[in-house]
Amino acid sequence: DFLLMGSANYPQADAQALANKLISIAELRKDVVAFISPNRGAFLNDSAVGTGTLNSAADMTSNVVGFYAPLTSSSYAVFDSGYKYMFDRFSDTFRYIPLNGDIAGTCARNDINNFPWFSPAGTARGGILNAVKLAYTPNQTQRDVLYSNRINPVIFSPGAGIILFGDKTGFGKASAFDRINVRRLFIFIEEAISAA
């Protein structure tokens, strides 16, 4: 049910091409949702020794919006706002990784604990696990910019931790299908009808 973009450690144009390819696969199949994160360069300036410095929050906002702007409008895609910092036990180091797997994980956890037609966002169901911090924590103004551009902000909320704070699909028009839970409900119904 999920297509993950994975790491987006490519130049922006290559990462956008990969994202559009995943969206086209999801649109063709109509039984999956593609989860997409921006390219790493939107947040980090990597040095030759493998360490990176973070861009400013204003730059990150414009970089993230710029990354998603040319992507195909689709209710079968979910766009998130960034990267989390976590411990990689296999390499015994901390690193930034994209959140697309975590956003898909909130949907999977929601399927187990609730139903696909419940929103995977918010403090009750949108918790991002195993994260030390975020590369980018948008403030209210930045969240408004992101959300109006089809991008689901992931934020740190005192008392709640790191949470998915939006439930939009990548659909570019106001519609019932611009919500993750509505798209997933219709996928669930179509599968149930075809199995009957």
Residue ranges of each PLM-predicted region?
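A glycine- and small-residue-enriched flexible loop/hinge signal that marks low-structured segments
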Residues: 1-196
